[in-house]
Amino acid sequence: TNKEYYARGMSALLDAIGKTINQVAARHNSSVDSAVPAKTVVVIITDGMENASKEYKLQTVKAMIEKQKKEFGWEFVFMGANIDAISVAGSMGIDASRAANYHADGVGTATNFVAVGKMFTSVRKGNSVADNWKEEIDKDYNSRKK
């Protein structure tokens, strides 16, 4: 209900990403090797621009992402609405091929989750994120672009 949750127009995106990376890395570090997944894929979905982080700065998050990619083979996927997702992802060290713009509505969000579901089905089979992972998201976004 509106009493429990309400939109405030704030996105602490860098804090969310930084905390997630640290928590997942800590879990991996405290696990026996056989319990650490062969692939780690971090999916970032936002409907707004960073404007509220207090703990993490852009350069810190970028360094964290680059370290996990280089040292541990993590993959990062970024989906953003109401922003230039390709540019924002790039500023964090996420390649344009792993970033997509989407419409923040029912169809756009559903399209995201279908694409992510297919992506994880492939990753679970031992594959990397496919180059065409965002094909349907791009098709939807471009067909309804204003």
Where in this protein do the model-derived segments appear?
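Acidic, low-complexity intrinsically disordered regions
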Residues: T1-K146
